[in-house]
């Protein structure tokens, strides 16, 4: 099933790229972004629509947890709407920040009301009872995961490789704990096929349609499996990318000084001379190593 999803996406992406070019469904580069990205203007976007929809299809066939599929669908709608508005308006502005945050929060709340998770967390072997505060924590996990993957999607191939480098080890970790969430691998197969066309020079971008959905799925899975804190270790790069934005904004507002040349962090490395390929390679290897270290520490691999 995983191989079938990979092959299906590999076959369909060239068709989708041609269709999007014909329909002029292209990326609009934000003005405050690096000047180095100007040549990417017009590259087909919303490419995540394919690996998400095929992932949803194979997820239903594989009897993936209904709540995961629902979360996947809700966050897909948010990402799709954001990209759609950007294409229609012919600029980089889709949903406004507060609109996106509101929709993500509402989606996460719907998920939590339906899931009704236990209110304890596993803090690396120690069980902590959070009571009603857990719902706020879980809300932050789901929305934060969605935004973190969205922030990571700024270079050709980056978000895709980070997802693959973290989701496969994460699947093995969950399997060791007696939990099977094959949607992680099913989506990973689609993302791998997508990367054939997204690695530099990208022929298509996943857009918010892809990145917001991937992050939403990861957050939902972590809440369902009570592995919220472990998720951070399998996806350290998105966490670091998010922290770089928070620190940059906070530093500028309080001290009127920037810590990085630009945030998220991958843009900082671009502006100090690193090539996109180098940044993607270093970030991916770092994320993969951190994931493998987690598997080693918790005895998943000998």
UniProtKB/Swiss-Prot annotation:
Keywords associated with the record: Cell cycle, Cell division, Cell inner membrane, Cell membrane, Cell shape, Cell wall biogenesis/degradation, Magnesium, Membrane, Metal-binding, Peptidoglycan synthesis, Transferase, Transmembrane, Transmembrane helix
Enzyme class, broadest EC rank: transferase
EC number: 2.7.8.13
Pathway, per record: Cell wall biogenesis; peptidoglycan biosynthesis
InterPro entries the UniProt entry points to: Glycosyl_transferase_4 (IPR000715), PNAcMuramoyl-5peptid_Trfase (IPR003524), PNAcMuramoyl-5peptid_Trfase_CS (IPR018480)
Membrane topology: Multi-pass membrane protein
Pfam families with a match to the protein in the record: Glycos_transf_4, MraY_sig1
Annotated Gene Ontology cellular component terms: plasma membrane
Gene Ontology MF annotations: metal ion binding; phospho-N-acetylmuramoyl-pentapeptide-transferase activity; UDP-N-acetylmuramoyl-L-alanyl-D-glutamyl-meso-2,6-diaminopimelyl-D-alanyl-D-alanine:undecaprenyl-phosphate transferase activity
Single GO biological process annotation from the record: cell division
Annotated signal peptide: none
Catalytic activity of the protein: UDP-N-acetyl-alpha-D-muramoyl-L-alanyl-gamma-D-glutamyl-meso-2,6-diaminopimeloyl-D-alanyl-D-alanine + di-trans,octa-cis-undecaprenyl phosphate = di-trans,octa-cis-undecaprenyl diphospho-N-acetyl-alpha-D-muramoyl-L-alanyl-D-glutamyl-meso-2,6-diaminopimeloyl-D-alanyl-D-alanine + UMP
TM spans (from-to): 1-21, 42-62, 68-88, 123-143, 154-174, 178-198, 204-224, 229-249, 279-299
Cellular localization per UniProt: Cell inner membrane
Reported cofactor(s): Mg(2+)
Functional note: Catalyzes the initial step of the lipid cycle reactions in the biosynthesis of the cell wall peptidoglycan: transfers peptidoglycan precursor phospho-MurNAc-pentapeptide from UDP-MurNAc-pentapeptide onto the lipid carrier undecaprenyl phosphate, yielding undecaprenyl-pyrophosphoryl-MurNAc-pentapeptide, known as lipid I.
Family stated for the protein in its record: Belongs to the glycosyltransferase 4 family. MraY subfamily.
Protein name listed in UniProt: Phospho-N-acetylmuramoyl-pentapeptide-transferase
The species this protein was found in: Thermotoga petrophila (strain ATCC BAA-488 / DSM 13995 / JCM 10881 / RKU-1)
